């Protein structure tokens, strides 16, 4: 059974960074269970909240939650990379705040049937969007050893990716999450297993591949700033070093000073970036926030 309890990560930091006005237009590109969106909607009684999620169950659940607060929201079952098309459909050109939480929601992890957790028995799945065909079962049982090696390194920077790819291909068919987890622990050297459960990184790599997460993020970032109003902000919460490097590089490209230091006139600053980490209190109350980092890009008013 799926738990609907989800504690939004860095909620206070999101609200503080956005400092929303009552007429603002806000986009939550990773709606989830509307943990962030519920609180943002309360801040914009005369504005508009736009929520997007790949997971239909997230849309259904969030709609009921948000309706208890107001009616000034629109929800879409879609990939966040489609935001430009959705805004055109809504005839909106600029927004005041954009939130992207790249973490998987607690209900998805806790629902054994979704196949995201290496601690719960389930058919290998890991699809955010249950309408798509590609799932973890197909990847684990059909990809070549070379393909598996590449995705394990590309999506989770697993150093012994070739060794793990060989273990997987040598033990097919692999049907379930726990079966894969047991195989990894059985055939990898004991010192590796003792140091860190190898399933964590392998499951991350598979999930990223199934949902095309890196490509979707890169595509999204291309046009994100163009839809920001002046003083608008983009907040992106990441949970691993690969995502964070992508976001850091993207945000950094807007604050890099291309004007030589010795010139008498410097280019006026157009953007600023701030970084936030979970507080000690949040870490104690929600251990899943441990690896979270939020970067916020602000478009400065000219």
UniProtKB/Swiss-Prot annotation:
Record field: transmembrane: none
Gene Ontology BP, a term: rRNA base methylation
GO molecular function: rRNA (cytosine-N4-)-methyltransferase activity
SUPFAM superfamilies: Putative methyltransferase TM0872, insert domain, S-adenosyl-L-methionine-dependent methyltransferases
Family statement drawn from the similarity comment of this UniProt entry: Belongs to the methyltransferase superfamily. RsmH family.
Role played: Specifically methylates the N4 position of cytidine in position 1402 (C1402) of 16S rRNA.
Name of the protein this chain belongs to: Ribosomal RNA small subunit methyltransferase H
Name of the encoding gene: rsmH
